[in-house]
Amino acid sequence: MAGFRNHLKREERKEKRKDILMKRIRPDRCRGASDSRLPSPIPARVYRTLDEEVKRRYHPIPPRYEHLPAFCLFLYAVAAVCLILLIIQSGSVAFSDWFNLHISAPLRAFLAALTAPLPFSLGEFTVLLLPLVLVVTLRHAIRRRCDSWRTAGVFIGVLISVLLSFFSVFVLNFSAGYRNSTLDVKLELEQKQVSAEDLADTARILVRHLNEEAGKLGFERDGFSVMPYSLAEMNDRLSDAYAAFCSSHDFIRNNAGQPKPVLVSEILSYMHITGVYSFFTGEANINVNFPDYTTPYTAAHEMAHQRGIAREDEANMVAFLVCIGSNDSYIRYSAYLNMYEYVANALYSADANRYRTIHAELNSATRGELSAYNRFYEKYRDSAASKVSDAVNNTYLHTQQVSHGTRSYGMVVDLTVAWYKAYPEK
């Protein structure tokens, strides 16, 4: 008798669970013979227990919706391995150096080669389409997938696995660049406390080079210099310059990646973003709304990221060295002028009188270009978007062990001073 009573209790519990599930299904989602709407979904285990007449009003949820797909489990496993790799990278500079050169470099080259034939930035389109994809995905999930707590949990698990795939790509492609040996060590530079005199000496060298290069360029009536070729031609010249630089330095590997213009450059201008490296597509993206003289140097900066130079001051420095090694006058001019802005700002803060003296030695065309840039930049200077963008970028850099955050961009001044102390003739 006891066994029979237990059997009845089990059957009662099954019936109660079935009743609960049936009550959760909205009556307006059921269909009759003349209703063109799809039948309401119901868990397969409940569907199998229904009478044939009742089954006509429902359809079983596909079993794949009630279990994480094998591919998602694979993504979770890869993310776990990448987390271990990230921990090792954070604790070992030597491992990060090796990983960046021998694991990340081939993967970066593969992604760059994969997306290079596209005439647009896949990374940009991914970001722009993301809101639409999220809306469509959530709508599909609510209407067709999440019919029970189990299927909702599976759906969330799938979304998390997709997010983790971005984390895995970041670790495999780029994170070691934030944790490897610093550029001053690689270039064998001796970095010391920078004095106002050091800044003045470096600024004078840059002014001398700017005066030499400016005489070879054309300037518009609005004060800006004119890049004498297309973006595609600029990319070819920068690729040649990078090939030469990478062949003479063993800490960087070249690849076929070239910068791509961003369609929403005006929006990026309000965010104070001149370029961005898309690590998940291997693309270097540049803001083409800014004046010409910023474009080659910005492109070279993003190409440095594309080749594994992750820290911002180091990407600035590599871009500078690559550009001044170019055979093209405008690319050299772009590098000298962008670096002069960094050094001159630091000199002005340290010794305003010295800054004014040295700035007066700059040729009138370049001084006019800097004045024109100030007028151009005025409408973007204090935008709300820039404050949000700066906060996000600053947080991201801190998470990558860049203690100075967005201020690290300006730390290229220390590297430049050390470079010209070691190589004053260059």
Where in this protein do the model-derived segments appear?
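Cytosolic-side transmembrane helix boundary signature
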Residues: 129-160
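Auxiliary, metal-adjacent structural segments of Zn-dependent hydrolase domains
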Residues: 218-288, 292
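Membrane-embedded alpha-helical segments of integral membrane proteins
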Residues: 80-141
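Active-site recognition of the HExxH zinc-binding catalytic motif
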Residues: 297-309, 316, 320
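Pan-zinc metallopeptidase signature
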Residues: 367-426
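Post-HEXXH active-site segment of zinc metalloproteases
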Residues: 311-337
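Transmembrane alpha-helices and immediately adjacent membrane-cytoplasm interface residues
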Residues: 136, 153-182
